[in-house]
Amino acid sequence: MGQKTHPLGFRLGITQEHKSTWYANFNQYANILKEDDKIRTYIHTISKANSIANVRINRNGLNDQIQLNIETGKPGILVGDLGAGLETLLNNVKKFLPANRQLTINVLEVEKVDLDASLLADLVAEQLEKRIAFRRAIREALQRAQKQNVNGIKIQVSGRLNGAEIARSEWIREGRVPLQTLRADIDYATQEANTIYGVLGIKVWLFKSEILSK
């Protein structure tokens, strides 16, 4: 049975950058990795409501200063009135960190939300949770991406589609999505939709362009 590589991990160092940037010695590594995992797990729980597309974690050489860059399609909702939402987020994230860590959060706006695989996956999940037919939800996301002149997009939905007794997977692709071409700038994201029939899995592949070396 054929096994598929992760589209982003496959391209690290070529078209993709690491989402965590820090260095640690042998004794520190496991603890810092756990901190990153706790931060990402918490932010994932609020990502759908706040349209969070990406989270990047940067640390200084001593690993006592953390810079958290959050990319979102709706920065106003995340920041809140007079920064109240951002202050709440800062306090909640600090709960997962030792007392000696200094945390800074930067909220960055995603300029083209229809060119982000994570936000498109959130859109499909939101539609499915509103009990809209899965093909209609996929088509709407495809059309929004095509208006941004992407080279290709593929969306797959898996589970008890439209309440069917037997779970299955269906996908629709428009244009090219060359997963084996390393120079292809592929964006990839997954999301879950909680429906009355169970959980539906959503995958989005977005082929933006080919990055050619000079």
Curated annotation (Swiss-Prot):
Highest rank taxon of the organism: Eukaryota
> Which biological process annotations from GO are given for this protein?
translation
Plastid: is it a keyword of this entry?
Answer: yes
Q: Where in the cell is it found?
A: Plastid, Chloroplast
> What GO MF terms are annotated?
rRNA binding; structural constituent of ribosome
Domain KH type-2: residue ranges: 39-111
Q: What is its main location?
A: plastid
What Gene3D superfamilies would the database entry show? 3.30.300.20, Ribosomal protein S3, C-terminal domain
Query: Does the UniProt entry include the keyword Plastid?
Result: yes
- GO annotations of cellular component type: chloroplast; cytosolic small ribosomal subunit
Instruction: Cite the entry's keywords alphabetically.
Output: Chloroplast, Plastid, Ribonucleoprotein, Ribosomal protein, RNA-binding, rRNA-binding
Protein family: Belongs to the universal ribosomal protein uS3 family.
Quaternary structure note:
Part of the 30S ribosomal subunit.
**This chain belongs to which protein, by name?**
Small ribosomal subunit protein uS3c
Species, as recorded: Phaeodactylum tricornutum (strain CCAP 1055/1)
Q: State the gene name recorded for this protein.
A: rps3
